[in-house]
């Protein structure tokens, strides 16, 4: 499932997508034998990702009821910064390391949400 949500009516000057923060919510499941390797690969990628100037938050959370199910939450200053992240060596390495780890019977989900910046400040 892929969902794109854009919120309008920002109080800080409009709802121009270029000026909005981008939140990604990704849900995925891995084969049981890949849980440790996924965590290790993600943590390496996270270390470099958090140093990117456009990254606001980057985390992965494991389900309490299913140890093979993970939730990834990312927040970026804008779409341009997210695009730059997609070209980084550390993300490409991570994606290469995990490419065969996914549970083929699980559909997963990907949501991209545009939000007004500094709403929580």
PLM ranges: what are they?
Residues 12:
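Short, conserved catalytic or interaction motifs in soluble domains
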Residues 44, 48-57, 75-110:
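An amphipathic, aromatic/His-enriched active-site/gating alpha helix that lines ligand/cofactor pockets
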Residues 15-19, 59-68, 95-121:
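Glycine-rich beta-strand-turn "strand-cap" elements at beta-sheet edges
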Residues 6-9:
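C-terminal motif of bacterial Sec signal peptides marking the signal peptidase cleavage site
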Residues 22-29, 59-86:
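Short, well-ordered beta-strand segments in beta-rich or mixed alpha/beta enzyme
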């Amino acid at each position: 499932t892929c969902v794109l949500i854009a919120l309008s009516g920002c109080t800080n000057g409009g709802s121009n997508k270029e000026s909005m923060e981008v939140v990604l919510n990704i849900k995925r499941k891995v084969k049981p034998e890949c849980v440790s390797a996924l965590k290790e690969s993600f943590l390496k990628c996270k270390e470099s990702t958090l140093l990117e100037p456009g990254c606001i938050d980057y985390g992965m959370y494991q389900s309490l009821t299913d140890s093979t199910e993970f939730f990834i939450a990312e927040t970026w200053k804008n779409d341009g910064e997210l695009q730059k992240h997609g070209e980084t060596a550390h993300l490409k390495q991570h994606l290469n390391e995990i490419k065969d780890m996914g549970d083929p019977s699980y559909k997963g989900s990907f949501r991209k949400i545009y939000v007004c910046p500094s709403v929580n400040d």
